[in-house]
Amino acid sequence: MRIRRPLTLLVIGALFLVLGAAQFAVSPGASAQPFGFNKLTPNQQRHVSGLLSLELGGAGLKAAAPARTSLSPVTSPGCSVNLGSNIKVNQNCLNLTDPALNGRGQAQNETWVSADPLNSQNIVAGYNDYRRGDGTCGVSYSTTGGQTWADATMPNGFVSGAAYGGAPREYMQGSGDPSVEWDTRGNAYYACQEFKRGSGVTEDADQSSGFYVYRSTGTNGASWNFTGRPVVEHNDVAGAGDFLLDKQLMAVDDGMNSPFRDRIYLTWTTFAADGTAYINEASSADYGEHFSAPVVVSTDSNLCANPATSTHPDGRCDNNQFSDPFTAPDGTLYVVWANYNNATSGGGDNHSQVLLAKSTDGGATFSAPVKVGDFNELPDCAAYQGGADAFRACVPEKGATAASIFRASNYPYGAVDPRSPRTLAVTYGSYINRNSNEANGCTPAGVSTTTGGDLYTGVKTEGACHNAIVLSVSKNGGAAFTGSSKDVRTLPVAESTAGQRTSDQYFHGMRFAPDGTLVVGSFDRAYGTDETTGFSDISVSTSENLASFGHVQRVTTSSMPPETQFNGLFYGDYFQLAVTGDIAHPVWSDTRATDLFLCPGTGTVGHPPQTCAGAGANFSPANDEEIYTASVSAG
């Protein structure tokens, strides 16, 4: 039987650090109450941000901040440079921040990147950017094929107030969850989630939010239209906190002969007060100026035998997250996502499933969901990392240490083979896979009764459990996939070296090259002592036959230490790469730069300010999160 889990509040990306005290509608006749951490269900607590759990759960930021006695003077100004072939994308020097606010005013993470199909020299990268203190949608652009970069500014300080009570302006406090794509005429588009925090963090009760799309016309990402055009907006000026909009991703129809050429699609999750979490979609046929009314994508299927609610108003597939839209040359829109409504076989079985639906009428209607494949989520962090990051999944390193505690999840991406418009590739992470299963000591062990997180034997044992990126393929336009009936333990994985077969790969990205080569990149612990220290690298691999992978390349010039900003709990939620011709451009959040603080006793009368390095909450020395890229062969 299915191990019943409450509906998860999978608040990710920018929401990790900006929602503050969200609120839900309460029972009829009761007044609205702040929706704090202690009112979340255990499974909801597992899926909200680690930083949010610290703030609302009582631990506070200062409790885990670097001790000032551990700080040591340094002479570096915090202006990182290229690291060999690894090119720095964001162009700022490091802001000094108080140890209690480590990460705020500094970090960049959660990357997306896309290249101009008309000119491969033009590349735009989006990321969460905390330089101003709170999160915002950061953007950098290159007109040299990724060899040099400049920062631009997303003009998202306020949006029209028409949907928020009619005032001329609605000033948003935070934003993030970036995705960037180009149309076939050289326009770039940037999707950004924007919101207000509410009274739990500020004196303003407003918890309004919305998704907005910005367009860059004629400047290749150097400038963007103002104000952002709304996709969907939620008026919550009163702070009722009745539902949450989360995790939007975008696709632009790039089929030159498509009946929906240049149509823009956004998909997202709506966490509603009735306990549901449906995937929704909206589209624009006028270059992002206006968007259609939302359409529910994740409707009903016998695959969803365990609905999260008794009413499930739009179908039994009511517990979802991590949607990704993509298009075919004939104009078909596909949406793939993670679903948590599947039945399980009992015992320790804790698998979930990836579903897909398609639209042939420009996003107006969708087919019933079909199964892409099963997957197993990353393990419960607290169970294996000394209680750290409770109610979250993470990527534990092997052995006795507990440095790798940042929130992580497995998610799907999809794309259509340019050589065969009915051939679809979907990649997603799975903790159980052909190299990590019962045969080598990694056995699913149900879920934690405390947090609802997934449990396994062998999580901290070298050579036993490790995450991998698996591939499921459809040859008939999404009607069926190789993973629909096959065990995840038999599917191809994007890692083919001996080191990768016994180490973790996570936070992956994927795209097809023009010649039909599938290119997959990921964070990778196959190098040096990464698997036992919690360090990581970036790797890229390719598949020419959609059955096996090779041509594995280590992209990073040295390993990246466990991230320490936001107390080691937030490293973003996803990663992407672009492919131009036979060149792949992965863009990632990098932790090799040392974080800096004001030295104790300086900045006082008679003692000029000096900068110091210091210990992080989970690793020493504390480090920054910056954006890097590289250009590597995709052939």
Locate each region found by the language model:
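C-terminal PAP-associated
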Residues: 33-635
